[in-house]
Regions:
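Short, hydrophobic beta-strand segments that form beta-sheet elements in well-ordered domains
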Residues: 39-42, 61-69
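Catalytic core and acceptor-binding pocket of nucleotide-sugar-dependent glycosyltransferases
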Residues: 164, 173-258
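Short, acidic, metal-binding catalytic loop of nucleotide-sugar glycosyltransferases
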Residues: 51-63
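Short beta-strand-to-loop acidic/aromatic patch adjacent to the donor-nucleotide binding site
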Residues: 109-119
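N-proximal low-complexity "stem/linker" segments adjacent to membrane-targeting elements
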Residues: 1-50
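Long, compositionally biased intrinsically disordered regions
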Residues: 244-245, 249-278
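Active-site-proximal specificity loops/subdomain of glycosyltransferases
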Residues: 67-108
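Conserved catalytic core of nucleotide-sugar-dependent glycosyltransferases
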Residues: 121, 125-203
Length: 278
């Protein structure tokens, strides 16, 4: 497997001893001591990350900033925000927020999260806040992704999307213990209970979040659906931009190099009514 896949959250070929992850997570937990409402954001562009920090703080949560090694730590860290180098123990060439998200139970009682390319109206931020703060331990919230119309009945392709959401320690621990969490190829999870179950899971789509849908549908997990229409408007992604430009056309996406190439954060903020936070 391409080594870069490990940092994206991929159980197939995952080679890092779990003991090493647990040790690293103890440091992440120490970094969040006294933080009741952490909200994970991922630095790929300083202006976008700064605006995300302000949005999070506006609703009374604490920005917890991780970052892709290709971009590095944020230049702007607002007072009260927390920066964590989730890659410090591993030295991976690429790291996505999926990596720490899979192990949320190790370092936080409750962890909100969203994409690095997502901005929201203040009205939406308050709706998300209310959902997140209303979660009981053992439950989580995320955006369901059932795919296009042709996939609506292909149940094994359905997944939950980490576009925006929140997990609790109990939910994250349940997913890890049962081997059905956020990462790709959840059939390769070390806690998959037996070979028969592994064969069952191998029939499912490989992508991230399929394990979360499986956890809900087959393992009794509690997931509160976040309506996609809440967040579609401010999701600045290649999916919604026909003339999206890649740094390496046809190659691996590099959001840190492409987000400012394709979207003007000032214009997006204006459209969402949050220019006052720039």
């Amino acid at each position: 497997m391409d080594p870069s896949q490990i940092g994206k959250g991929n159980w197939k070929g995952f080679s890092i001893p779990l003991a090493d992850v647990f040790e690293a997570a103890s440091e992440w937990r120490d970094s969040l001591a006294g933080v009741d409402r952490p909200w994970l954001c991922w630095n790929v562009s300083d202006r976008w990350c700064t605006l995300q920090q302000r949005l999070i703080q506006e609703v009374g949560w604490t920005p917890v900033i991780g970052y892709d090694p290709r971009c590095g730590p944020p230049k702007t860290v607002l007072p009260g925000s927390v920066v964590i180098d989730f890659n410090a123990h591993f030295g991976l060439e690429i790291m996505w927020p999926h990596f720490p998200l899979e192990f949320a139970f190790l370092f936080s009682d409750r962890l909100a999260f969203w994409h690095a390319d997502l901005l929201c109206r203040m009205e939406t931020m308050h709706k998300l806040k209310d959902v997140f703060e209303g979660l009981q331990d053992g439950a989580m919230a995320a955006v369901p992704d059932l795919g296009s119309r042709r996939h609506i009945y292909r149940l094994r392709h359905h997944r939950y999307w980490e576009l925006a959401g929140c997990t609790t320690r109990g939910a994250s621990k349940s997913q890890f213990d049962q081997g059905a969490g956020w990462w790709r190829f959840f059939d390769h999870h070390p806690n998959c209970p037996n070979e028969k179950e592994r064969r069952r899971r191998a029939k499912y789509y490989y992508d991230s979040g399929v394990g979360i849908m499986y956890w809900k549908r087959r393992l009794g997990g509690q997931v509160v659906n976040i309506p996609r229409q809440w967040v579609d408007e401010g999701h600045c992604t290649s999916i919604s931009k026909k003339n999206y430009r890649q740094v390496q056309p046809g190659g691996q996406r590099n959001l840190s190099a492409e987000i400012d190439l394709n979207f003007d954060v000032t214009e997006v903020a204006k459209q969402l009514g949050i220019s006052h936070l720039l």
